[in-house]
């Protein structure tokens, strides 16, 4: 799905292998707060290796004696990885369950503490990643590329995981827009997200291709750093350009839905022109009831550090909720993901 999308720093020359072992992909979830210690929900921090999120949630539900829909999470995590993530168990008026029964060689309970709010999808600050890429080849320019990514970022593309194996989530969305009824709400949401993500990626790729990844267009919608507050100005000013250069504001692209575009003027015309070939997709998202939203055009990994040792690169960084680690890797090198006989279910994204 991402093969035709533009690269911010040009097509990478380096090659490597991602996830040769589960320990090569470590994700630690950061809620951004600590559970308060009281309330009818129990937040459970779990370390799991080679297990998917839904399976572990089912084990926790059985241990707590509750229905499986009483167990929630902030974001799906890759199966072939070592991940630390939080689960929420709704236990109103019930005593603390013995969750140790779910522990095994691949599952450890790290913490359990009550909280007064439900753990919902996206209810987190972000994720800390430590990746180990092996079998490096043609890596002479890798150090310079790492420096460029650290200072300029990468395209904030939705990763392959959003679209399903072979793009089957998009095929399902297309069928749904053509009139096929999807009764399962979760599947329907998945297909709508895939369609919306495809359109977003198309806008981002077009801006990069036109040399507009770091350049303001009249009417561009920008987002304040560290918040989801957005605004647009039809008349470009030196002050706004300076704020963009300093990182105080970020360029954004449309997440398509009902209502007026938040961008104006030339920026709105650009987005509409890019999406003109996707009119049926846009119409389908609007009829499904999704509203216009925005997402940053670029993604700048935080706390980024790395160690190059022969044919092995160890890379660490923090990404905000909703961002994809594989989008960082894609810009860095042509990484082949080791085949472990199952599809990775997600990429530590928070379910934008």
Swiss-Prot record:
Catalysis: reaction(s): uridine(13) in tRNA = pseudouridine(13) in tRNA
GO cellular component: cytosol
Gene Ontology BP, a term: tRNA pseudouridine synthesis
Gene3D superfamilies, A to Z: TruD, catalytic domain, TruD, insertion domain
Top-level EC class as recorded in UniProt: isomerase
Transmembrane annotation, as ranges: none
Known role: Responsible for synthesis of pseudouridine from uracil-13 in transfer RNAs.
Name by which UniProt lists this protein: tRNA pseudouridine synthase D
């Amino acid at each position: 799905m991402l093969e035709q999308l533009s690269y911010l720093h040009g097509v990478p020359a380096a090659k490597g292998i991602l996830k040769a072992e589960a320990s090569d992909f470590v994700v630690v979830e950061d809620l951004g707060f600590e559970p308060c210690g009281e309330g009818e929900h129990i937040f459970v921090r779990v370390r799991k290796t080679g297990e998917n999120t839904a399976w572990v949630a089912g084990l926790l539900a059985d241990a707590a004696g509750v229905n499986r829909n009483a167990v929630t999470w902030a974001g799906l995590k890759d199966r072939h990885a070592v991940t630390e993530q939080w689960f929420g168990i709704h236990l109103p008026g019930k005593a603390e369950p013995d969750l140790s029964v779910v522990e095994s060689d691949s599952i450890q309970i790290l913490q359990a503490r009550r909280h007064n709010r439900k753990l919902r999808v996206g209810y987190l600050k972000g994720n800390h990643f430590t990746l180990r890429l092996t079998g490096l080849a043609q890596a002479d320019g890798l150090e310079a590329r790492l420096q460029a990514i650290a200072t300029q970022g990468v395209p904030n593309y939705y990763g392959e995981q959003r679209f399903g194996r072979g793009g089957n989530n998009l095929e399902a969305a297309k069928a749904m827009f053509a009139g096929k009824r999807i009764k399962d709400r979760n599947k329907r949401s998945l297909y709508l997200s895939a369609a919306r993500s495809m359109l977003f990626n198309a806008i981002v790729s077009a801006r990069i291709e036109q040399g507009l990844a770091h350049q303001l267009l009249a009417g561009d919608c920008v987002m304040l750093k560290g918040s989801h507050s957005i605004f647009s100005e039809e008349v470009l000013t030196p002050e706004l350009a300076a704020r963009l250069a300093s990182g105080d504001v970020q360029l954004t692209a449309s997440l398509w839905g009902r209502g007026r575009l938040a961008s104006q003027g030339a920026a709105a015309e650009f987005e509409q022109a890019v999406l003109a070939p996707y009119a049926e997709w846009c119409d389908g998202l609007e009829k499904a009831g999704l509203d216009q939203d925005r997402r940053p055009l670029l993604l700048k990994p935080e706390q980024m550090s790395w160690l190059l040792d022969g044919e092995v690169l160890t890379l660490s960084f923090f990404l905000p909720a909703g961002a994809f680690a594989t989008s960082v890797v894609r810009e860095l090198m042509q990484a082949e993901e080791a085949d472990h006989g199952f599809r990775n279910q997600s990429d530590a994204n928070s379910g934008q």
